[in-house]
């Protein structure tokens, strides 16, 4: 009787593990599809530190115009097992003076929050992030100080961005150099 109970429990445990693996498999299949369909602009590149782990990767954006021209910004992507029903977690690893990216690397992009839906993909996020560098949005800021400066004194904002990208202090915050050249 005890052996029968043990066998039933093992079977149940095996089924639960199988269903968990199916969820991960669905996320892996979808991310594989998204990566195969990536159409990166020449200002973006991906890096997979572990080629066997497609759920964790880096996106490097190097804008060729706008305030952030000639900068190099690295974003870490962490894709969860509920992808595409939940968006990936995206953080900026490069500290940047930007209204929509806070000093901890959190990114304010609507499709990473309330506007996410399963028909969106990694390509959508790449273009959204790239757009943030071309057109920072002071109306929906994470870095309120940068947003205020952008709204009230565009020239000062541009100077602050350049100073931060060269490696310097803006206010009390020191930024590492992130220039390509």
UniProtKB/Swiss-Prot annotation:
Annotated stretches, region: Interaction with Uba3: 4-7, 24-54
InterPro entries recorded: Ub_conjugating_enzyme, UBQ-conjugat_E2_core, UBQ-conjugating_AS, UBQ-conjugating_enzyme/RWD
Tissue expression from the record: Expressed in the wing disk.
Tagged with keyword Hydrolase: no
Sample GO molecular function, one term: NEDD8 transferase activity
Residue positions of the active site: 108 (glycyl thioester intermediate)
Membrane-spanning intervals of the chain: none
Transferase as UniProt keyword: yes
EC annotation from Swiss-Prot or TrEMBL: 2.3.2.34
Domain UBC core as annotated: residue spans: 26-170
Pathway in which the depicted protein is active: Protein modification; protein neddylation
GO cellular component labels: cytosol; nucleus
Entry-linked Gene3D superfamilies: Ubiquitin Conjugating Enzyme (3.10.110.10)
Gene Ontology BP, a term: negative regulation of smoothened signaling pathway
Record keywords: ATP-binding, Nucleotide-binding, Transferase, Ubl conjugation pathway
Reaction(s) catalysed (UniProt annotation): [E1 NEDD8-activating enzyme]-S-[NEDD8 protein]-yl-L-cysteine + [E2 NEDD8-conjugating enzyme]-L-cysteine = [E1 NEDD8-activating enzyme]-L-cysteine + [E2 NEDD8-conjugating enzyme]-S-[NEDD8-protein]-yl-L-cysteine
Recorded family membership: Belongs to the ubiquitin-conjugating enzyme family. UBC12 subfamily.
Subunit structure, as described in the record: Interacts with Uba3.
Free-text note on domains in this protein's UniProt record: Both the N-terminal docking peptide and the catalytic core domain must bind the Uba3-Ula1 complex simultaneously for optimal transfer of Nedd8.
Role, per record: Accepts the ubiquitin-like protein Nedd8 from the Uba3-APP-BP1 E1 complex and catalyzes its covalent attachment to other proteins. Required for Cul1 and Cul3 neddylation. Negatively regulates full-length ci stability and hedgehog signaling.
Protein name: Nedd8-conjugating enzyme UbcE2M
Organism from which the protein derives: Drosophila melanogaster
UniProt gene name: UbcE2M
């Amino acid at each position: 009787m005890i052996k029968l109970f043990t066998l039933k429990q093992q079977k149940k445990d095996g089924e639960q593990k199988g269903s968990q693996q199916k969820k991960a498999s669905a996320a892996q299949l979808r991310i594989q599809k998204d990566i195969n369909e990536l159409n990166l602009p020449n200002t973006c590149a991906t890096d997979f530190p572990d080629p066997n782990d497609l759920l964790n990767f880096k996106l490097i954006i190097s804008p060729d115009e706008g305030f952030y021209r000639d900068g190099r910004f690295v974003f870490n992507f962490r894709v969860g097992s509920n992808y595409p029903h939940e968006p990936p977690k995206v953080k900026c690893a490069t500290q940047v003076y930007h209204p929509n990216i806070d000093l901890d690397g959190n990114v304010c992009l609507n499709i990473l929050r309330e506007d996410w839906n399963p028909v969106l993909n990694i390509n959508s996020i790449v273009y959204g992030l790239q757009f943030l560098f071309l057109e920072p949005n002071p109306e929906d800021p994470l870095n309120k100080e940068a947003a205020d400066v952008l709204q009230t004194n565009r020239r000062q904002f541009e100077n602050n961005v350049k100073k931060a990208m060269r490696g310097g202090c803006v206010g009390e915050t020191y930024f590492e150099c992130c220039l390509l050249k």
